[in-house]
Amino acid sequence: DPRDVLVLPQGAEELDPSRPIGCASARRAVQLRALFPGVAVAPVRGNVLTRLRKLDEGQFSALVLAAAGLKRLGLEERITRYFTVEELLPAAGQGILALQTRAGEELSCLDGVLDADGTDCARAERAFVRALDGGCSAPTAAHARLEGDTVTIDGLYVTDAGEVRRG
């Protein structure tokens, strides 16, 4: 699942505009400022459990995290709302599981598991980021999908002048 999610403090039903939304990436921060004008966005550090503790202690009105990470940790019940990829474009490769093996290993046991379409989309997303000379901390986003035989990418990047480009 490549989507980002909104997580509110336990017991809360809506955002508290007096406290910031916490996120750990420039990509999310840029998009959140457009989605929630007037609400502050602040960095949050630590592993997922530490971030959730900070949220529940009142340091933030909400957190924005990767859906896949919460699901893998068995914390899906903490998800308040899923953002569509149109609302918040994910990081390239977000939600994708990868397997690294040694050269020459027998991989036929993976024949029923590998997803060729997903692999093509992941490669396209990575190529988009590479073409922009982006990295883990650069505010870039990419979401690829297969439309027939064509891979289509929705992408986002921030120019050196701070302009957000999306298309």
Residue ranges of predicted features:
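A conserved helix-loop-strand patch within extracytoplasmic ligand-binding domains
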Residues: 1-38
